[in-house]
């Protein structure tokens, strides 16, 4: 084998390895996500909701990898979401005193927010509101 062939083989194998790693990072959260709550479970938990809001995909901060579409309800015991989220690792749910549309808004307001909990599913979720959160 010539040096040129060896270099091409090494380069193509490295490209395939990097591509496999990137695809694995994207797919792993989808494969390891727990089952999402059913629509009836979400409806039961959201029956005492005090507030309702929506996630829209057309916000300034949304892109192919960061979006959500659906209805959020906020109650004393649960915050529920019926809809879909972009797959991704380590989603956290925060309550903010102001509207947040972009990552810059989030970073600016993060110190004033209350972290409620982790979101582990990409379709429908229910998160317990911790004691002491009003």
Predicted features by range, described:
Residues 1-6:
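N-terminal Lys/Arg-rich, disordered targeting/topogenic segments
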Residues 92-94:
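Beta-strand signatures of extracellular beta-sandwich domains
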Residues 84, 96-99, 132:
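Solvent-exposed coil/turn segments that connect beta secondary-structure elements
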């Amino acid at each position: 084998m010539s040096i040129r062939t060896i270099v091409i083989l090494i380069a193509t194998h490295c490209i395939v390895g990097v591509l496999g790693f990137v695809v694995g990072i994207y797919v792993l959260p989808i494969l390891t996500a727990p089952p999402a709550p059913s629509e009836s479970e979400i409806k039961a938990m959201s029956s005492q909701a005090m507030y309702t809001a929506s996630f829209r995909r057309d916000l300034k901060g949304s892109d192919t990898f960061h979006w959500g579409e659906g209805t959020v309800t906020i109650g004393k015991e649960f915050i529920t979401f019926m809809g879909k989220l972009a797959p991704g690792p380590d989603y956290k749910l925060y309550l903010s005193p102001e509207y947040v549309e972009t990552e810059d808004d989030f970073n600016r307001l993060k110190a004033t927010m209350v972290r409620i909990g982790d979101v582990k599913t990409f379709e429908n979720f229910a998160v317990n509101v911790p004691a002491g959160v009003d």
